[in-house]
Each structure stands twice: as structure tokens, then as C-alpha cells.
Amino acid sequence: MDEGILARLITFTEDVVLCIVLNDGRKMITNGKKILAGKIEGELASFILSASKEFLEDKKVGVKKFKDYDIYFERIDINKFLKSIGGEFVKNTITVSELLELIKKEDVIIVDTRSPREFKEETLPGAINIPLFLDDEHALIGKTYKQESREKAIEIATDIVEKSLKRILNEAKKLDRDKLIVVFCARGGMRSQTMALILQLLGFKVKRLIGGFKAFKHAVDK
């Protein structure tokens, strides 16, 4: 399962259906009521949305045909999915509910690794901002991803991180080493993973928020 799908799945709290157009690899995630993620549109999207309902009710896996398309459907049990993810992806991670409980019980430093613009718009209560990418850098990476390729965007991001290490390290020096640090980004993806690695190498106790800011918003806005 690719990182993009993983990043989306870990933001949900209820079972969803993963749908893949086998002809071209396009993906969509739905809860049977609306499209939660994916770029499929038109009649095909409407068919997938309607067909996905039976996989939430009865079937778990199956393939359906719509015109010239073969679509794979798989119900994802979110609770089992989160428990089953292993290895480095979930090492030293924390869920939203665990973070909320942790805040009540002990001192914790919450670090928002998103861009300054994202941080100013909205963040977690009490969070401080140590951005992996500054506003113009974040915009450049996003533009490159959309207009050129994922590989080129990653190449640019890697170069930026290398040049930004001094800035990040200077900010990290201000953190209290006796406190647990929880880092997050938009979806719990590359930015928070990278920042967590940097802080761990510096000897800090670090946990990464699963699902990032989106998961937190979803939980508190229910």
C-alpha cells in the first residue's frame, strides 16, 4: 500500500472502503456516503460510491465492472488496520486520544512541523512551530509535485532540509530535554517523520501524532 493511501487511512476513525480502478491504478476512499479521498470523477465515481455500500454491509473484498473498468473494492477495518501497522511507520507514535490524555497527566511539548502560514491559520492548543519547510519552500515543493513529479518534489525537499538543518537545530536547542515531545504535520506524513528523526538523533524523547492535524481536527470537531 503506497504512502499516500496510508496517510489518508490513518486519519479516519470509522471503517471505509478502498477502491482501486484496476485498469489504471486510480484510487478512491469512501465511507459509502461520500468520497473521502481520490481524484476519480463523473459517472465512474458515482458508481464506485454506490457500489461501495455493500462492502461496508456484507462483503469485505470484491471486484465489480462498470463499462470498460474493473474496480477492486476492499473494506478497511480502521481499528484493526491501525493495530496491524508495524515497523518504523508506527514506531514511537501516538494517537489523538492518547495525546489528549497525556496532556492532562504530564508535561509535553507539542511541535507543529507545518509551514508558518499553516501554523498561523490554526494549530493544536499550546503547540509551537518548528517548520520543516518555510512558506515559500512548502509552496515550491507542492507546485513541483503537481506540475512535474513526485520524485522531483522529493529531490527538492531533500535539498531544502539539508540547507535548513542549522535553523532547525537552533530551534531544537530551546526545547526542554526532560519533556516528551510530540510532533505533527498535516497528515502525519513526511514532515513530522523527518522532524521526529532529527529530534531523536539529538537525544530527545519524541512521539509522532498519527494522522497529524487532520486527525486532531476530526476528533475534536465531532
Curated annotation (Swiss-Prot):
Gene3D superfamilies: Rhodanese-like domain. It holds the Pfam family Rhodanese. Residues 104-221 form the Rhodanese domain. GO terms for molecular function: tRNA 2-selenouridine synthase activity. It comes from the Archaea. GO terms for biological process: tRNA wobble uridine modification. This is Uncharacterized protein MJ0052.
